[in-house]
Curated annotation (Swiss-Prot):
Membrane topology value: Single-pass membrane protein
Organism, scientific name: Paracentrotus lividus (Common sea urchin)
One Pfam assignment: ATP-synt_8
Chain ranges passing through the membrane: 8-28
Protein family per UniProt: Belongs to the ATPase protein 8 family.
Matches recorded under InterPro entries: ATP8_metazoa
Originating gene: MT-ATP8
Protein name in the entry: ATP synthase protein 8
Subunit structure and binding partners: F-type ATPases have 2 components, CF(1) - the catalytic core - and CF(0) - the membrane proton channel.
Length: 54
């Protein structure tokens, strides 16, 4: 059944390329989000707490 094999080849082709494109989009969005969080984290004031044992 060559038509069925060709149909599965097309389906697998689109599934693989969709997965690759989604992965690239997620990676690109994560890099921009990390750049935003690194600039925001520089403005955070760090305070320490002195613990007192009873």
């Amino acid at each position: 059944m060559p038509q069925l094999d060709f149909t599965w080849w097309i389906i697998n082709f689109f599934i693989i390329w969709t997965a690759i494109l989604l992965t690239l989009v997620i990676l690109v969005n994560n890099k921009t989000a990390q750049n935003l969080t690194t600039t925001d984290s520089l403005q955070i004031e760090k305070n320490s707490t002195n613990w007192q044992w009873l």
